[in-house]
Amino acid sequence: MNQATQDFIRQHQDDDVRQLAFLGSKYPEVDMPFALDQIRGRKMARVKLPRWASLEGIIYPPHISMEQCSSESTALYKAELAARLLDLPASSSGIEMKAENEIEFVDLTGGFGVDFSYIAARLGVKSMYVERQAHLCEAAKENFERLGLKNAIVKNGDGIEVLHSFLPKKDDAASTDDSLGITYDQPLSLLKTKLGLKLIFIDPARRDDAGNKVVSLKDCTPDVTVLQEEMLSKADYVIIKLSPMLDWHRAISELSHVREVHIISVNNECKELLLVLSARNLGDMEASSADGEVKHAGNLRIYCVNDAQSFVCDELDMESSPVKIAPSTLEEMQYLYEPNASLMKAGCFGVLSDRYDARMLSKNSHLFVSQAPIEAFPGRSFRIIAISSFNKKELKRHLSGITKANIATRNFPLSVAELRKRLKLKDGGETYIFATTLSDES
């Protein structure tokens, strides 16, 4: 990047990139496409990656990579997850390891490097970032230096071929095939780890060659269903990052040794699905329920996270906790609850009902009610001020004086738009209306 481009970026960092795009002929010495990427990227980073945005000299990728990269909050979550898996104390982070230490963490699909940077900094172990696109590797080298990562190795190459280069955890052989078509920044011997990796992170692409989104785990690139056994033979843990649109039940049926499912939401919008795999004997991997009781060590555990809220249950909980259905009269019910997006995705409604002593309005409503207020319910809570049938006169009486409301439908024959039109209400205000079908189909 020449000085003219640097000056242009600094002088126009708050300007509209759509207007700046017309100034190319006025600034022939400026690398305009690159400059616009930097200005646009830093604006996005102020919201998505505030720590990165606060640093001078961070290089941002083209717009699509910025849209697809993790946010700071989700990257921090993954970093803490990795630290827990590796049994690191809560206070340890960013420990610079000696050069002779073997690689313990590898990100096989580095991308913009957000997840890698936070995980590597938290673990403090020698870590490798692998990415096929050279321009992302160049940006990663610059950015990791500015972020103070002293333990990062950047590799421009194919993640699968790099995976093949690592020895299995129990293989003490001293030699492997050096005839790989990859140029490494460090001697290939660094890959000949005898003890095996501690952690592999992989984020397979969820689009096909035509750019269309795929819904099956096997259609992602690389295909982790094919790679899983090799990854598990070479690392204690594997974290797979997936689209929240994927069916996690189907995904775990296509994989072996899935130990944890993490459904991560930000501002009640489901952002990521993480699967933790391990072939280790995980009898010591215990998680506490809401009341502090350790349950079903070693069983598949589901983490439903929305910002600071976290709800943990496991497969046995889900199998042994039928949903409690509310009586259709609802006369004594005073409070209504809407589970957050992660819980909706997880579908652990029986556990939710049992743990908080709440009743679901009907099997398919996914709305809960209770007589007494429930503190710290993982979702939105409302005080019920009126319950009405869909009778026109009854609705008119309850809606008297209300001109606008926030409307949601659950298991209801009309859409929100249709219901709003029928009720003649504007959007917004402090009133919330939930339209649903009760257990008696009323």
Q: Locations of the language-model features?
A:
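SAM-dependent transferase fold signal centered on methyltransferase-like domains
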Residues: 1-442
